[in-house]
Amino acid sequence: MQNDIKKNFEIIKNKYGDVASWAVWKSPDNDNLATNMDIDDLFDIERNPELLKQLQNNIIMVGYNFSRQTDDFPKFHNFHSFKGDNVNHTTLRNASKIRYAFKGTPYWGAYMTDIIKNHPESKSKNVDLSNLDEDFRIFRDELETLQADNPVIIAFGSKVYTLLKNHLKPQEYSRLIRVTHYAHYNDGCATHEGYRSKVLNQLSID
């Protein structure tokens, strides 16, 4: 992150911490790649000061919408879990595929958000798209708050990619990349290894 990184982090946390997060996770147990997805003190910069060195404000990962109600969840919970969370195992496993796919890549530490915010719905076909102007106003404000400059935007799935392609101007990003959604189980993406291979190919990473 640029400029005053700590100040910028706190602004993002206070303004969008309920709906966004960062592509940083704890390491899983060796025998279970879906473990250790909870945030605990991960985003507490007093207890984890090394966190700020990992964060990137010019890479943005974008999902579609929340799949569940998120009232009273801790800051930066999105794409993670937390102690006491009764998240569905499949949902947690799918999110852990993101961690596995991006670990050790230049995209680790990216900012993560959803286009449709505050609309929990597990079935994407039921998501309300009647307020897209406001959704994209908020998204642009996120980018401005991040001080993102011509960011690389990674869209999880074709629905998100199409929305971004249709509503953003080409000069608002340097690259817009569609990657397979982490809930996708075909084309070898059912496993963590298969999903990583697919995503790295789509990102043109050897």
Positions of PLM-derived features:
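A polyanion-binding, active-site-adjacent surface
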Residues: 2-151, 160-162
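Short, flexible coil/linker elements and helix-boundary hinge sites characteristic
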Residues: 16-17, 169, 204
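General "foldedness" signal
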Residues: 73-76, 124-126, 167, 188-196
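Short beta-strand scaffold positions
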Residues: 155-156
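Short alpha-helical interface elements
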Residues: 163-164, 204
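Short, aromatic/basic amphipathic alpha-helical patches
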Residues: 164-171
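Short, flexible loop segments at boundaries between secondary-structure elements
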Residues: 172-206
